[in-house]
Amino acid sequence: MLLVIDVGNTNTVLGIYHEGELEYHWRIETSRHKTEDEFGMLLRSLFDYVGLMFDQIEGIIISSVVPPIMFSLERMCIKYFQIEPQIVGPGMKTGLNIKYDNPKEVGADRIVNAVAAIHLYGSPLIVVDFGTATTYCYINERKEYMGGAIAPGITISTEALYSRAAKLPRIEIARPDHIVGKSTVSAMQSGILYGYVGQVEGIVKRMKWQSKKNPKVIATGGLASLIADESDCIDIVDPFLTLKGLELIYERNRVESV
């Protein structure tokens, strides 16, 4: 079995693969201050819940956009699983040709998403990831990672509105009954949701225009389904795209090292 770990700024997603299939997955809050033992005990409780043992894990791969957490995570893998984890980063075989000015600047999550999307859906592609930041990645017809756009995530924007405007409440991100809100809450929901739909459609439209292609648009992340329901520009929602990419990269590097 393979343990895959995707560390984001807000949430960490863990998955267990067995014979190429995702059997279990969990989403937990990302904590920069947990020790290796706290991570170990957390995973112990998750494993116990589904009847797994640590010694069933044969490999571990981690992608992270939160460097401070990595020391504790790596130590946890060694102490509790007796496994040196693969870390997505420079020097790892991904099969992705990155055309960024400085390829080392591309976040591990964006690389992993691109690898999975190319493998599953072909190219050209636009991959939209609704996370703490909303990222847009363009992959051309030669399967080259050309770059993209990074915008504040929908949750960050909502929290900023709440914290900076004294009379505006904290709200649930949800589809309002009408685009013309009849209350403060519904008006905020309308502005936030449809403002983000407009952002997605605008950036995707401009990427397509600049590329002079008609790339398939793949969305992932916690709010992907909500946005996709309101827009025709998203072709496929794949909530486990990042975990799939981690499994692919692990297998490529495992085969390479054999």
Swiss-Prot record:
The active site is at 109 (proton acceptor). The keyword Translocase does not apply. It is found in: Cytoplasm. It catalyses: (R)-pantothenate + ATP = (R)-4'-phosphopantothenate + ADP + H(+). The keyword Metal-binding applies. GO terms for cellular component: cytoplasm. SUPFAM superfamilies: Actin-like ATPase domain (SSF53067). ATP binds at residues 6-13, 132. Keywords: ATP-binding, Coenzyme A biosynthesis, Cytoplasm, Kinase, Metal-binding, Nucleotide-binding, Potassium, Transferase. K(+) binds at residue 129. Its main location: cytoplasm. A monovalent cation. Ammonium or potassium. GO terms for biological process: coenzyme A biosynthetic process. Its cofactor is NH4(+); K(+). InterPro entries: ATPase_NBD, Type_III_PanK. Pfam families: Pan_kinase. Substrate binds at residues 100, 107-110, 184. One of its GO terms (molecular function) is pantothenate kinase activity. Homodimer. Catalyzes the phosphorylation of pantothenate (Pan), the first step in CoA biosynthesis. This is Type III pantothenate kinase.
